[in-house]
Each structure stands twice: as structure tokens, then as C-alpha cells.
């Protein structure tokens, strides 16, 4: 199994290996601006979590639009945080490739919950702006440089 289909990411010409990223709320990857993934529950219907993630990303995009932000990036400020595999699943096809996937941290918002009720309340009613997210607005010059 290939993490995110084997896509190789880079930001401003610098490679960002997926195994070095942390999952912010299980949907954004640290260090990758404007990037979200939908990973479902391993203990319940996969689509329940994917639906919550999609709703939350739409809330985030609306927030960015209202405040004229063009970039949102998840930043891990706790470099000494203990990590573990993002997917807590013991199937052979996952176990063989788990080192290629993002990690999760040992505290919020980097800890992946496998709890639909908790996630529903958190994703639908939490504040969008927190200390782990940075928002930026690109200037015309910035945008031209990245074309």
C-alpha cells in the first residue's frame, strides 16, 4: 500500500517526505500548506470520519475566504512530542507499509481519535483558528513567484 498514492510532496522546492509529517486532527499534514486528506475510522464506518473531515475542510475554506487568507498550514510546535503510526490497524497490508505513512502525536490536535461522538462535537463546533494552524495571505508578487 502506498501512502497517499505515492505522491512526492515539496514546498518551495524542498522535499517534504510523508513519513516526517504529523496528522493535524487526522486530516492535514504538518508542513504542507492547503493540504487535507480524508482518513476514516478503523473501528467504525470509514465514511463517518471522511464526512466529518469534509465538513471541517469546508468550514476551514470558508473561514479562509472570509478573512482573505490564501494559505493554511499545520505547524507542530512540539518537536520533542512522542509519535506513533497514524493508522492504528494491524492488518498485514497496513503493517508492511506503515513506515511510509504520516505519524500522529501524543496530544491534541496531533492525536487521532477513533471516537465519532468526540470528533462530531470537535469538528463541527471547535474554533477554526488555533496555535497549530498558521494562516497567510499571498500578495500578487508572492503568487507570481509560485506560478
Residue ranges and their predicted role:
Residues 23, 34-147:
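C-terminal, flexible cofactor-proximal segment of oxidoreductases
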Residues 1-46:
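Glycine-rich loop(s) and the adjacent beta-strand/alpha-helix scaffold that form part
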